[in-house]
C-alpha cells in the first residue's frame, strides 16, 4: 500500500525507499527516477560505505555517479566500523538537507537493517564496546566459540536457542550485552515486544539491535514514506543475475581489489568490511584456503543467501509496493495515485 500523500503534503515531506535484493536492478532504476523526479539518492548499503571496496560491492560507476550522485558511499575506511546507529544519524541529516531544498530523498539499497533502523529507531540495547569485544575474541581464540555458546546457554537459554554456535557476530553481541548489563539479551526482546519467549525464527538480527519487528512506529520518521521493493518474480532470474554479476566482478579485477586490501597489513577477515559477501570468500581464496573453482562457487552461493535473507525481510515489510520490473513508469504511476505529482510536477 502507498500512503495517500494529499492529506499530509503540508506537514510531512516525502521520501522514497527503493529496496530489494542484491542484483535486482535498484541502481539503474534509481538513476532513471532521478531523470524525472527531483530526487537525490542516499545509499542504504552497509558495504558501499567503505572506501577502496568498489568492484565487490557493485558501487555505481563514476559515469553513473556523475548522472546521479549518491550520498553515504565511500565515507569509511575498511578498518573502521559503521553501525546501523551511525547510518540512521547520517541518513537523517542527509534527508533533512535534501528535503530542506524542496527535493525528495530517494533511499536506495538492500541493507534491510538500515532501513529498519531509519523507520523504527534503535533498541535500548547498549552500544558496542570495542575493548570488551576484543576480550571476547581472545576468549574465543583460546577456548573456542563453542565455549562461549555454552556460556550463553547457561545465562540466556532463550537466546542460545536462536543463535547458532557458528553465528559469531550474534553470539558475540549476546555475550557482550550480558556482560555490559548483567541481563540476558532476551530480556530486552521481551520488554520491547510485550511478550515472553515468543520470537519468530526469521533471523536473530531482528532482535539484537532493534525494536520489535512489526511495531507500528513508522510515525517516528518525520516523512511521508513511499516504499518500493524491486525483485524479479522468478527466483531463477535473480540467481542468474547474481552469477553473471559475480563473474563480471572477477573479470573487472575484484581479486586485485582484495589483494590491495590485504596488502595494507592493517585489515583482517574478522573486520565487518572484510566479512562482506564476496570479500570474505576472496580473502579465503587468496590466503590459500580454497581453490579457484570452490571460491567462485562459494562466492555465488553466499550472494544467493544474502538475497534470500533480504527477501525474507521484505516479505514481512508493511506498506510496500512490489515491482517486478525496473520500469520507472510503474513507480511514477504509483506515486501519482498518492497525489505526489501535484506538488512536484511530474508526469
Swiss-Prot record:
This one is known as tRNA dimethylallyltransferase
Q: Where is this site: Interaction with substrate tRNA?
A: 111, 133
> Which gene underlies this protein?
miaA
Where do the segments described as Interaction with substrate tRNA lie?
45-48, 169-173, 275-280
The positions annotated for binding substrate are: 22-27
InterPro entries for the chain: Dimethylallyltransferase, IPT, P-loop_NTPase
Q: From which organism does this entry originate?
A: Marinobacter nauticus (strain ATCC 700491 / DSM 11845 / VT8)
UniProt EC number: 2.5.1.75
Classification via NCBIfam families: miaA
**Enzyme class, UniProt record, top EC level:** transferase
Cofactor requirement: Mg(2+)
Q: Which UniProt keywords apply?
A: ATP-binding, Magnesium, Nucleotide-binding, Transferase, tRNA processing
Asked if the record carries the keyword Transmembrane helix, the reply is no
Per the record, what are the reactions this protein catalyses?
Answer: adenosine(37) in tRNA + dimethylallyl diphosphate = N(6)-dimethylallyladenosine(37) in tRNA + diphosphate
What does the similarity note say?
Belongs to the IPP transferase family.
Q: Which residues form each disulfide bond in the chain?
A: none
Residues that coordinate or bind ATP: 20-27
According to the record's subunit comment, the protein's assembly and interactions are: Monomer.
On whether Ribosomal protein is a keyword of this UniProt record, the answer is: no
Spell out the molecular function terms from Gene Ontology: ATP binding; tRNA dimethylallyltransferase activity
Output the superkingdom of the source species: Bacteria
Role: Catalyzes the transfer of a dimethylallyl group onto the adenine at position 37 in tRNAs that read codons beginning with uridine, leading to the formation of N6-(dimethylallyl)adenosine (i(6)A).
Question: GO biological process: what's one of them?
Answer: tRNA modification
Amino acid at each position: 500500500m502507498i500512503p495517500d500523500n494529499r492529506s499530509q503534503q503540508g506537514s510531512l515531506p516525502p521520501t522514497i525507499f527503493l529496496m530489494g535484493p542484491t542484483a535486482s536492478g535498484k541502481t539503474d532504476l534509481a538513476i532513471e527516477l532521478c531523470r524525472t523526479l527531483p530526487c537525490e539518492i542516499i545509499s542504504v548499503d552497509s558495504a558501499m560505505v567503505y572506501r577502496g571496496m568498489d568492484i565487490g560491492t557493485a558501487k555505481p560507476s563514476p559515469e553513473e555517479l556523475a548522472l546521479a550522485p549518491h550520498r553515504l558511499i565511500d565515507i569509511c575506511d575498511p578498518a573502521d566500523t559503521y553501525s546501523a546507529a551511525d547510518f540512521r544519524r547520517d541518513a537523517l541529516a542527509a534527508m533533512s538537507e535534501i528535503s530542506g531544498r524542496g527535493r525528495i530523498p530517494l533511499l536506495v539499497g538492500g541493507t534491510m537493517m538500515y532501513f529498519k533502523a531509519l523507520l523504527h529507531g534503535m533498541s535500548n540495547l547498549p552500544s558496542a564496546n570495542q575493548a570488551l569485544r576484543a576480550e571476547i575474541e581472545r576468549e574465543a581464540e583460546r577456548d573456542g566459540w563453542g565455549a562461549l555458546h555454552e556460556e550463553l546457554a547457561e545465562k540466556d537459554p532463550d537466546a542460545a536457542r536462536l543463535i547458532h554456535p557458528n553465528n559469531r557476530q550474534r553470539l558475540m553481541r549476546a555475550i557482550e550485552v550480558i556482560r555490559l548489563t548483567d541481563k540476558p539479551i532476551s530480556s530486552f526482546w521481551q520488554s520491547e515486544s510485550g511478550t515472553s519467549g515468543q520470537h519468530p525464527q526469521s533471523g536473530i538480527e531482528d532482535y539484537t539491535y532493534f525494536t520489535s519487528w512489526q511495531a507500528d512506529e513508522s510515525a517516528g520518521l518525520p516523512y511521508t514514506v513511499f516504499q518500493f521493493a524491486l525483485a524479479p518474480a522468478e527466483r531463477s532470474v535473480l540467481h542468474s543475475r547474481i552469477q553473471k554479476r559475480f563473474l563480471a566482478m572477477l573479470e573487472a579485477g575484484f581479486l586485485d581489489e582484495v589483494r590491495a586490501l590485504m596488502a595494507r597489513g592493517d585489515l583482517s577477515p574478522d573486520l565487518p568490511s572484510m566479512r562482506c559477501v564476496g570479500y570474505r570468500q576472496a580473502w579465503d581464496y587468496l590466503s590459500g584456503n580454497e581453490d579457484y573453482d570452490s571460491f567462485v562457487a562459494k562466492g555465488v552461493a553466499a550472494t544467493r543467501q544474502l538475497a534470500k535473507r533480504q527477501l525474507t525481510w521484505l516479505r514481512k515489510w508493511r506498506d510496500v509496493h512490489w515491482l517486478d520490473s525496473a520500469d520507472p513508469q510503474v513507480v511514477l504511476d504509483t506515486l501519482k495515485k498518492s497525489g505526489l505529482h501535484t506538488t512536484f510536477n511530474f508526469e
